[in-house]
């Protein structure tokens, strides 16, 4: 195992994820000092935010995020969210490489950067998912341009329902779901890095030390 290459991977991954999370916080109305430019407003059975109608679920998660930023700091919340997505997506990759899970993040093809988790759902093969999420997903699947939204809902559901992921890391905080980077599926995003990295060799995935080394390098 080449730890120098693992360090390069972890460093690059952290930079990509932190940039994505910070951008997401900005899109949700948070300034670098933790103050907000706008808050969602409840209306009837839902809410509005930045001129758009949003769900009660979004409103509740945004308020939870605002509370976390106020109680701690925006920098700490951003770090937590980036690492949450790092460790879970890396763990999923390790499970797949060891035959403990079906392919999730791998692409349907190199010409179309759509993860198999999404393409399978588009073909009617859904992961375990609660009724409310299934209703939202069914609406999203009517529009192939909403790949990011489809992936966000599916990967959150996958993490909640996978017993190994839950045993290792626990459940994802509700507000962390809002901070999944919107560029995570783009060319150069974190999923792209996972699928194309040369820093992690095939034999590395079979080593029980891999996740420990990546954690150490990520936080260093």
PLM region descriptions:
Residues 1-220:
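Preference for the N-terminal adenyl/adenosyl cofactor-binding alpha/beta module
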């Amino acid at each position: 195992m080449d730890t120098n290459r693992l360090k390069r991977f972890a460093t690059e991954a952290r930079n990509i994820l932190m940039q994505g999370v910070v951008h997401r916080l900005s899109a949700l109305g948070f300034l670098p000092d933790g103050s907000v430019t706008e808050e969602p407003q409840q209306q009837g059975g839902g809410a509005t935010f930045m001129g758009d109608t949003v769900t009660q679920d979004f409103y509740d998660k945004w308020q939870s995020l605002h509370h976390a930023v106020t109680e701690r700091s925006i920098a700490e919340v951003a770090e937590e969210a980036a690492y949450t997505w790092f460790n879970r997506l890396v763990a999923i990759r390790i499970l797949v490489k060891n035959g403990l899970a079906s392919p999730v993040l791998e692409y349907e093809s190199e010409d179309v950067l759509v993860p198999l988790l999404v393409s399978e759902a588009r073909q009617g093969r859904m992961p375990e998912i609660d009724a409310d999420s299934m209703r939202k997903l069914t609406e999203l699947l009517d529009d192939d341009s909403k790949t990011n939204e489809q992936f966000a809902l599916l990967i959150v559901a996958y993490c909640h329902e996978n017993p190994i992921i839950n045993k290792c890391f626990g459940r994802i905080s509700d507000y962390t779901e809002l901070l999944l980077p919107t560029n995570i599926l783009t060319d150069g995003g974190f999923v792209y890095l996972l699928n194309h990295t040369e820093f992690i060799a095939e034999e590395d995935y079979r080593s029980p030390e891999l996740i420990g080394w990546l954690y150490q390098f990520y936080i260093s």
